[in-house]
């Protein structure tokens, strides 16, 4: 049912309209508690056990704000949330979805082991019949992708070097998690944050 709805929306709406509709559906799904047992959304419901008021948090692969919005609410006005999202069309809708989250800053970068321009791809439309917003990947091999984006890559260890504290990291970046977490090792060792990392 959900995949069919995604396909219909993707085929009938322009990309931004599709992204806005998908995010609205997710937030409705979340408010109604319907995603508690769905593998792709269940972890957002565990955030109250992981994030506290006043925490400094980083959401790497912020996508449309599914986690960042909840993290922002939990961290509260004394907290700080950095939402990292490199893909411009997704980031535009993310900005709209986080407009009431005054403690959140959106960073327009991909994180990795180097700094500079990077090609990103997304092949989900060919595979699923719709654009999967969480299926963007760094295209290191240089092959053609169905949808391609250019982004700016930064080292997380440099981007966040001046943070006075770091309490929580969520990292979901389509197989690039190990690269980013290894590159950010100095920050992880310094602050020992709680980490929610996709692994497979």
Which residues does each PLM region occupy?
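Phosphate/nucleotide-binding beta-alpha loop and adjacent structural elements of enzyme active sites
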Residues: 1-200
């Amino acid at each position: 049912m959900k995949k069919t709805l995604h396909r219909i929306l993707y085929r009938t709406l322009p990309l931004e309209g599709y992204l806005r509709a998908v995010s609205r559906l997710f937030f409705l799904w979340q408010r109604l508690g319907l995603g508690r047992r769905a593998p792709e959304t269940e972890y957002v419901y565990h955030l109250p056990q992981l994030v506290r008021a006043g925490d400094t948090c980083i959401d790497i692969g912020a996508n449309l704000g599914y986690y960042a919005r909840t993290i922002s609410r939990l961290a509260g006005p004394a907290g700080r949330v950095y939402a990292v999202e490199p893909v411009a069309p997704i980031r535009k809708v993310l900005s709209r979805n986080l407009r009431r989250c005054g403690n959140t800053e959106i960073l327009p970068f991909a994180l990795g082991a180097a700094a500079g321009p990077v090609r990103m791809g997304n092949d989900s439309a060919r595979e699923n019949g719709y654009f999967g917003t969480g299926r963007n990947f760094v295209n290191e091999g240089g092959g053609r992708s169905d949808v391609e984006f250019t982004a700016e890559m930064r080292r997380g260890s440099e981007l966040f070097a001046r943070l006075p504290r770091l309490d929580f990291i969520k990292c979901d970046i389509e197989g690039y998690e190990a690269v980013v977490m290894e590159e950010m090792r100095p920050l992880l060792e310094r602050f020992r944050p709680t980490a929610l990392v996709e692994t497979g």
